[in-house]
Protein backbone atom coordinates (compact mmCIF):
# COMPACT_ATOMS: atom_id res chain seq x y z
CA UNK A 1 0.00 0.00 0.00
CA UNK A 2 1.27 3.47 -0.88
CA UNK A 3 1.16 6.26 1.65
CA UNK A 4 1.32 10.01 1.07
CA UNK A 5 2.10 12.41 3.92
CA UNK A 6 0.85 15.77 2.70
CA UNK A 7 -0.07 19.21 3.97
CA UNK A 8 -3.78 19.42 4.74
CA UNK A 9 -4.47 21.65 1.73
CA UNK A 10 -3.54 18.72 -0.56
CA UNK A 11 -5.52 16.05 1.32
CA UNK A 12 -8.29 15.92 -1.28
CA UNK A 13 -5.94 15.52 -4.26
CA UNK A 14 -6.95 12.34 -6.11
CA UNK A 15 -4.59 9.46 -5.35
CA UNK A 16 -4.63 5.71 -4.80
CA UNK A 17 -2.35 6.18 -1.80
CA UNK A 18 -3.50 6.28 1.80
CA UNK A 19 -3.33 9.99 2.66
CA UNK A 20 -1.99 11.22 5.98
CA UNK A 21 -2.68 14.95 6.10
CA UNK A 22 -1.23 17.44 8.54
CA UNK A 23 -1.88 21.10 9.25
CA UNK A 24 1.25 21.78 11.28
CA UNK A 25 3.96 20.20 13.40
CA UNK A 26 1.49 19.43 16.19
CA UNK A 27 -0.58 17.26 13.84
CA UNK A 28 2.48 15.23 12.85
CA UNK A 29 3.54 14.89 16.49
CA UNK A 30 0.09 13.49 17.34
CA UNK A 31 0.29 11.05 14.42
CA UNK A 32 3.70 9.89 15.63
CA UNK A 33 2.64 9.78 19.28
CA UNK A 34 5.50 12.03 20.37
CA UNK A 35 5.81 15.22 22.41
CA UNK A 36 7.18 18.21 20.48
CA UNK A 37 9.22 19.24 23.52
CA UNK A 38 11.15 15.96 23.31
CA UNK A 39 12.45 16.74 19.82
CA UNK A 40 15.74 18.63 19.74
CA UNK A 41 14.98 20.51 16.52
CA UNK A 42 13.33 23.89 16.05
CA UNK A 43 11.78 25.56 13.02
CA UNK A 44 12.56 25.15 10.15
CA UNK A 45 14.11 21.74 10.87
CA UNK A 46 11.29 20.57 13.15
CA UNK A 47 8.94 19.78 10.26
CA UNK A 48 11.64 17.72 8.51
CA UNK A 49 12.32 15.83 11.75
CA UNK A 50 8.64 15.04 12.22
CA UNK A 51 8.28 13.89 8.62
CA UNK A 52 11.21 11.52 9.18
CA UNK A 53 9.48 10.17 12.31
CA UNK A 54 6.21 9.78 10.39
CA UNK A 55 7.98 7.67 7.76
CA UNK A 56 9.52 5.56 10.53
CA UNK A 57 6.05 5.15 12.08
CA UNK A 58 4.59 4.01 8.75
CA UNK A 59 7.42 1.62 7.91
CA UNK A 60 8.34 0.21 11.32
CA UNK A 61 5.45 1.21 13.63
CA UNK A 62 7.79 3.10 15.96
CA UNK A 63 9.21 6.60 16.42
CA UNK A 64 12.70 6.72 17.88
CA UNK A 65 13.03 10.32 19.06
CA UNK A 66 16.29 9.56 20.88
CA UNK A 67 17.88 8.36 17.65
CA UNK A 68 16.50 11.34 15.75
CA UNK A 69 17.99 13.71 18.32
CA UNK A 70 21.49 12.33 17.63
CA UNK A 71 21.39 13.88 14.15
CA UNK A 72 23.57 17.00 13.92
CA UNK A 73 22.62 19.92 11.69
CA UNK A 74 25.36 21.10 9.34
CA UNK A 75 27.35 24.10 10.55
CA UNK A 76 26.11 27.57 9.53
CA UNK A 77 22.47 26.46 9.32
CA UNK A 78 20.79 28.51 12.02
CA UNK A 79 23.79 27.82 14.22
CA UNK A 80 23.23 29.57 17.55
CA UNK A 81 26.26 30.95 19.32
CA UNK A 82 26.01 32.49 22.77
CA UNK A 83 28.72 35.08 23.19
CA UNK A 84 30.03 36.67 26.35
CA UNK A 85 27.39 38.64 28.20
CA UNK A 86 24.85 35.93 27.21
CA UNK A 87 23.97 37.45 23.85
CA UNK A 88 22.79 35.16 21.04
CA UNK A 89 24.23 35.39 17.54
CA UNK A 90 22.85 33.13 14.82
CA UNK A 91 24.96 32.13 11.83
CA UNK A 92 22.68 31.20 8.95
CA UNK A 93 25.13 31.79 6.12
CA UNK A 94 23.93 28.59 4.42
CA UNK A 95 20.62 30.37 3.80
CA UNK A 96 21.27 31.04 0.14
CA UNK A 97 17.72 31.86 -0.92
CA UNK A 98 14.75 33.93 0.18
CA UNK A 99 12.78 30.94 1.50
CA UNK A 100 15.60 29.93 3.84
CA UNK A 101 15.82 33.47 5.20
CA UNK A 102 12.05 33.58 5.70
CA UNK A 103 12.19 30.33 7.69
CA UNK A 104 15.01 31.71 9.83
CA UNK A 105 12.99 34.84 10.57
CA UNK A 106 9.94 32.73 11.49
CA UNK A 107 12.04 30.81 14.00
CA UNK A 108 12.90 33.97 15.90
CA UNK A 109 9.65 35.92 15.36
CA UNK A 110 9.04 36.22 19.12
CA UNK A 111 12.34 38.06 19.68
CA UNK A 112 13.64 41.42 18.60
CA UNK A 113 15.95 40.62 15.68
CA UNK A 114 19.03 42.44 14.49
CA UNK A 115 18.99 41.02 10.95
CA UNK A 116 22.02 41.22 8.69
CA UNK A 117 20.95 40.97 5.06
CA UNK A 118 22.81 41.44 1.83
CA UNK A 119 25.21 40.20 -0.72
CA UNK A 120 24.45 39.55 -4.35
CA UNK A 121 20.75 38.80 -4.75
CA UNK A 122 21.25 37.99 -8.46
CA UNK A 123 18.19 40.10 -9.28
CA UNK A 124 15.80 38.05 -7.13
CA UNK A 125 12.93 40.03 -5.62
CA UNK A 126 13.26 40.43 -1.87
CA UNK A 127 9.68 41.66 -1.41
CA UNK A 128 8.43 38.35 0.02
CA UNK A 129 11.07 38.46 2.75
CA UNK A 130 10.10 42.02 3.65
CA UNK A 131 6.41 41.06 3.68
CA UNK A 132 7.33 38.46 6.33
CA UNK A 133 9.22 41.08 8.33
CA UNK A 134 6.25 43.45 8.53
CA UNK A 135 4.88 43.60 12.05
CA UNK A 136 7.93 41.91 13.60
CA UNK A 137 10.37 43.54 15.98
CA UNK A 138 13.36 43.80 13.65
CA UNK A 139 16.14 46.11 12.52
CA UNK A 140 17.95 45.41 9.27
CA UNK A 141 21.66 45.89 8.74
CA UNK A 142 22.23 46.04 4.98
CA UNK A 143 25.53 44.83 3.54
CA UNK A 144 26.93 43.91 0.14
CA UNK A 145 26.22 44.91 -3.42
CA UNK A 146 22.45 45.04 -2.88
CA UNK A 147 22.55 47.16 0.28
CA UNK A 148 20.93 50.15 -1.43
CA UNK A 149 18.11 47.94 -2.72
CA UNK A 150 17.62 46.59 0.83
CA UNK A 151 17.52 50.10 2.26
CA UNK A 152 14.84 51.07 -0.29
CA UNK A 153 12.76 48.00 0.61
CA UNK A 154 13.15 48.73 4.31
CA UNK A 155 11.83 52.25 3.70
CA UNK A 156 8.96 50.92 1.56
CA UNK A 157 7.92 48.44 4.29
CA UNK A 158 8.63 50.91 7.13
CA UNK A 159 11.27 48.68 8.74
CA UNK A 160 14.20 50.31 10.57
CA UNK A 161 17.46 49.75 8.70
CA UNK A 162 21.09 50.78 8.73
CA UNK A 163 23.36 50.66 5.68
CA UNK A 164 26.59 49.02 6.82
CA UNK A 165 28.21 48.05 3.48
CA UNK A 166 30.37 45.25 4.95
CA UNK A 167 29.77 42.47 7.47
CA UNK A 168 32.25 43.76 10.06
CA UNK A 169 30.47 47.12 10.21
CA UNK A 170 27.12 45.37 10.74
CA UNK A 171 28.54 43.18 13.51
CA UNK A 172 30.08 46.22 15.22
CA UNK A 173 26.78 48.14 15.06
CA UNK A 174 24.79 45.20 16.43
CA UNK A 175 27.32 44.66 19.22
CA UNK A 176 26.56 48.19 20.45
CA UNK A 177 22.82 47.46 20.79
CA UNK A 178 22.24 43.71 21.24
CA UNK A 179 20.50 42.74 24.48
CA UNK A 180 20.34 39.23 25.99
CA UNK A 181 16.66 38.86 25.07
CA UNK A 182 17.35 39.69 21.42
CA UNK A 183 18.76 37.80 18.45
CA UNK A 184 21.49 38.83 16.02
CA UNK A 185 20.82 36.91 12.81
CA UNK A 186 23.08 36.68 9.77
CA UNK A 187 20.90 35.17 7.05
Q: Which role does the model predict for each range below?
A:
Residues 2-8, 114-117, 136-145:
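Short internal beta-strands
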Residues 18-35, 74-80:
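Acidic-glycine-rich active-site phosphate/pyrophosphate-binding loop
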Residues 10-19, 151-157:
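Short, aromatic/basic amphipathic alpha-helical patches
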Residues 1-2, 16-19, 136-138, 159:
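A short helix->loop->beta-strand "cap" motif at the edges of active sites that frequently abuts
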Residues 7, 185-187:
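Short beta-strands and strand-loop turn motifs
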Residues 35-137:
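Nucleotide phosphate-binding/pyrophosphate-handling subdomain across enzymes
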Residues 1-13, 21, 25-28, 36:
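Flexible active-site lid/hinge loop adjacent to a nucleotide/diphosphate
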Residues 26, 30, 126-182:
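C-terminal helical cap/extension that packs against the catalytic core
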